[in-house]
Amino acid sequence: SPLDTAYGAKIAEYTTEKYFMTELVDHLPLSDKVPSPQKVLGYAVGTPNKLTYTKDLYRYYRELAAASPRVRVFVAPEKSEEGREQMLVLVSDEANLAKLDRYKEITAKLADPRKLSDAEAHTLIAEGKPFYWASGSIHSPETGSPEMLMEMAYRLAVEDSPFIEDIRKNMIIMITPALEVDGRDRMVDLYNYRKANPGKPTPPLLYWGKYVAHDNNRD
């Protein structure tokens, strides 16, 4: 793939320790059809002093899915306690996504081995594809993963290296951009407040949501 050299320079600039840099992340592929996070959001993932609200995470994934047949977006029928959307993103090659219902069926059958003979299980395993689930921000102070997952989804959708092509061909990647959407946005609020008000006290813990101090949407 051609490289986005300007984005690659930002990766080098923003990476704080050399041991974080590997050949998998020290560059960004360039696409004339599929937008990078910077093209949609106006800044590169990992930009210092910048966190992204869930609505903007979702805006990026929707544009990614609109531009790439390797990406699909699903939204849960239920909203969070505070009324926010809850999104799931899938990345795989086009052939796998075309057979998504079949792969879901196989995975569901394999989940209960009591109903399968060994031979049936082996047949299903040979036909099926594993689902790999990456979730961001299980706890709201975990601020990095929702940012990073946007870049990971873009890499998986665009890059044509043998390593990435092998991933797309042989598995279906599920991404939850932010598992704890309410706390994520409140954490971004808090971070922006502290940036704008250096030295002032942090808002009290009651600021955090409708449950006692912490809402993980898991009750």
Question: What do these predicted ranges mean?
Answer:
Residues 1-51, 59:
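N-terminal pre-domain segments of enzymes
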Residues 3-10, 53-60, 82, 144-152, ...:
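Stable alpha-helical elements in mature extracytoplasmic
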Residues 9, 33-38, 69, 84-86, ...:
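Sequence-level motif detector for i,i+2 pairs with an aromatic at +2
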Residues 15-18, 22, 65-68, 156-160:
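Sec/Tat-exported extracytoplasmic proteins
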Residues 49-96, 101:
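A non-catalytic alpha/beta surface segment that caps or lines the substrate-entry region
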Residues 92-97, 102-219:
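Active-site/substrate-binding loop(s) of hydrolase catalytic cores
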